[in-house]
Design a protein with these regions (language model features):
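Conserved Rossmann-like nucleotide-cofactor binding loop
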Residues: 108
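Nucleotide/phosphate-binding catalytic cleft detector across ATP-hydrolyzing
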Residues: 1-105, 113-167
């Protein structure tokens, strides 16, 4: 089995207007590379998934449309709970977790899932990814105490909003 991996960081530089031109260019370049790889290795079915950056970007639908027109790939944009579900399925195939939580920390978002009897019970996607928090709250390197406090408050605020999450 061949494996290709590329870190794109679509969220980097995202503003209220959406994904930046440079981020979209990185995305297009990577998707073209993956498409060429799939075509050259005889892959019949491609199931491309877009997650938090595209889901949350004001111009996410434009990005999806351009990918379809320019590259010939139909991106599926996952909702946050669905993303948490797929993270859980992947985790349960790797670890013997019976009850507990699965947490996937990405650049843009964090998916957290409740697992009972080795089954997905509930999930949520939070805008608590490392890049999202840094771009929102941190201007200094290293971060100031005030910036760290703001990040901690945002994490607590978003976690408190999940009704099924234990205290």
């Amino acid at each position: 089995v061949d494996q290709v991996r590329e870190v794109v960081r679509l969220r980097k530089g995202m503003t209220d207007e959406g994904l930046s031109e440079s981020a979209m260019a990185r995305g297009f370049s990577t998707l073209r590379l993956f498409k060429r790889f799939c075509d050259s290795t005889g892959v019949d079915v491609i199931l491309p998934i877009a997650t938090s950056a595209v889901r949350e970007a004001a111009n996410g639908p434009l990005f999806v449309d351009r990918v379809a027109r320019e590259i010939g790939i139909s991106l599926r944009v996952l909702g946050g709970e669905r993303e948490a579900y797929y993270d859980t399925v992947g985790a349960l195939n790797e670890v013997p977790l019976v009850e507990g939580s699965v947490v996937d920390i990405g650049g843009g978002s964090v998916q957290i899932s409740d697992v009972r009897d080795r089954s997905f019970r509930a999930g949520a996607s939070l805008t608590l990814g490392a890049l999202a928090l840094t771009e929102e709250f941190v201007e200094h390197d290293p971060a100031t105490e005030d910036e760290i406090n703001q990040v901690e408050e945002e994490i607590a605020r978003q976690l408190d909003a999940i009704a099924w999450l234990p205290e």
